[in-house]
Amino acid sequence: MARPVVAIIGRPNVGKSTLVNRLCRSREAIVHDQPGVTRDRTYQDGYWGDREFKVVDTGGLVFDDDSEFLPEIREQASLALAEASVALVIVDGQQGLTAADESIAEWLRTQNCKTLLAVNKCESPEQGLGMAAEFWRLGLGEPHPISAIHGAGTAELLDQVLTFLPPKDEESDEEEPIQLSIIGRPNVGKSSLLNSICGETRAIVSPIRGTTRDTIDTRIERENRRWRLIDTAGIRRRRSVNYGPEFFGINRSFKAIERSDVCVLVIDALDGVTEQDQRLAGRIEEDGRACVVVVNKWDAVEKDSHTMTAMEKELRAKLYFLDWAPMLFTSALTGQRVDSIFALAALAVEQHRRRVSTSVVNEVLKEALSWRSPPTTRGGRQGRLYYGTQVASRPPSFTLFVNEPKLFGDTYRRYVERQIREGLGFDGTPVKLFWRGKQQRDAEKELVRQQNRQG
């Protein structure tokens, strides 16, 4: 079975996300002094002793508010409880017992999940005992005083959490999942796409821009592989965002790109490529991530048999940073071609991790040189490309040894990259070329050593 799940439940602004960051030793959950900052359920890896588990952070539960998101937040919490070994219920010791806490306790009794009660914001043991006493009235068992921000009482709380987890021998070793992030501007359909992929309401979907404010992690199996899907807050130009939860969510989205194996860049078919889409494309290429471009809302486009070809040409002209990325036209609403995302992403990841022998690299370079010689300067100096070798993967990176790097202009460098792609593939991944000066005799000796090392 997969690692056990611990669900974090409570009303808004009692410190759930702060506790998640404490339990998972991270800063991934957005923490801000505004109620309701976390709206979707988000997953992180938790560790205590020799045990590993998943911590799922849910949106703040409220039962006396008419916000349009509240039914969805309660549904997210129910889904989290359905997969959890224990629900860690968080209350605010400084504010004391509230009617909202009592409503949550009553609702929890209708759910089939064991509970553990933590009284947060107890900054000293003496203070904590007094604050915790009144929470016995909730009927959720012994209240445990803690301070999520300072760590007081959290060790004892985690010891209690472990007693609710299944025995360790019931867990199996898992291959590390492929990290796939869903990236795009607000309201291009990222959360709808995630829900279509998963077949459940995994992220709250609304026509209001910026509905998703955290990065949301989901584990799923497709194409005989395990995936960790990351739906991110919509990324806008920084000057249009005020400091607050949305600002922190945007920064989290950029971090999601950094920790991804492959990014799915979602473009709105009705809007086309915007300046912000171009910035995102550049960020993905700059960070060296594999990528699939998904053009969503294809069902809403009036089209004939030529529309897709014409639109792809137009989009690619503007997304020149990602001319190597496959492009897929989808509809999250109807599910059209959504399943194909995984096939393309799996291929992109495979190419992103691929390594090629030095002999094969140099066969391709020899062919490239036979078709087009390096440029010659006005003074009669000609560039000479001695040999190349792959020095890294993720992304594939090559060092090309030449007589003098400055003799090779951008045009010829792009030509060599195109020839490497045509000869070796690497669809769906950026390729990095490093041009290094070397004396011919030294280059020839180094090439022999490289070939002997690879057998």
Swiss-Prot record:
Binding site for GTP 2: 184-191, 231-235, 296-299
Gene3D superfamilies referenced in this protein's UniProt entry, alphabetically: 3.30.300.20, P-loop containing nucleotide triphosphate hydrolases
Residue ranges of every copy of the KH-like domain listed in the record: 354-439
Pfam families per record: KH_dom-like (PF14714), MMR_HSR1 (PF01926)
Annotated S-S bridges: none
Keywords: GTP-binding, Nucleotide-binding, Repeat, Ribosome biogenesis
Signal peptide: none
Residues of the EngA-type G domain: 4-169, 178-353
Annotated function: GTPase that plays an essential role in the late steps of ribosome biogenesis.
Name of the featured protein: GTPase Der
Species, as recorded: Synechococcus sp. (strain CC9311)
Lineage, top ranks: Bacteria, Bacillati, Cyanobacteriota, Cyanophyceae, Synechococcales
